Amino acid sequence: MTSGHALQPERPERKGETALAVEQLRRSFGGVPAVDGVSFGISRGEIVGLIGPNGSGKSTTVNIVSGSLRCDSGRIQLGGSDITNRSAYEVARLGLTRTFQIPRVWGQLSVAENLLVAGTQLADESATRALFGRRALRRRQLDLESRLFDILETLNLSSLAKQAAEVLSGGQKRLLEFGRILMSGASVLVLDEPFAGVNPVMCRALQDIIESLRADGCAVLLIEHNLQAVEETCDRVIVMATGKIIAEGSLAVVRNSEEVRSAYMGTAS
């Protein structure tokens, strides 16, 4: 499996520029805080791990950030856009793509069709036609087709291009999810346990894809229980417990925090 770096739509190199900013996020259920004053930022070209024990508020946080859940208060900035409490569809159109613990694919569509749909996610065909005419729209379609073939080859999915996505193995569906990211050209990625249930070879392949996306200027928020993969992949980590951020820094540093040890009941050591 080759690197996906060359396959990405061109993005300006702006490493260090804030891509995602979360400020004082709060959400309660039945009066019980699930997310309580969470604030963090991620820069372009940075991979940040979000870890914590079960019930720490990680899932609620990423659901809010990706538009799947509304917050009670707080603010979320995606680049220069305020995406607070905007729908998942709107958030995706603005450049934030999310994967899930269990890979989600459009089962009735073929592998190639899944990728093509992702490629049109950030573009409005009617607007393209109105502004630039049919010739420009056709050029964009040809570009999508070219990227499609490159990505299928890179992910070793060429032989499955016409296969219905619903019959793929779990690992193949995970690859297809990442292929859709490559097609979409998203600038911020929220990856929810991408290494869960995959073998070491597949884990390494996914890490290579994530690294290529980072090299291309993507900002990545990685939610993961596999601490070895987190240490190998992330620039820094954020640790949550009881709805709050309790530590932030390198994994080597935060795992020695007494508060982190207490939250994990010793499992983080």
Model-flagged regions — what are they?
Residues V230-E232:
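A short, surface-exposed alpha-helical micro-motif characterized by mixed small hydrophobic
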Residues A127-L160, D208-E211:
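Conserved ABC ATPase "signature" region
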Residues S66:
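Helix-to-loop junction immediately C-terminal to a conserved catalytic motif
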Residues I51-P53:
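The feature captures the beta-strand-to-loop junction immediately N-terminal to the Walker
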Residues M1-R26, S269:
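ABC-family P-loop ATPase nucleotide-binding domain
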Residues L189-E193:
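Catalytic Walker B motif of ABC-type/P-loop ATPase nucleotide-binding domains
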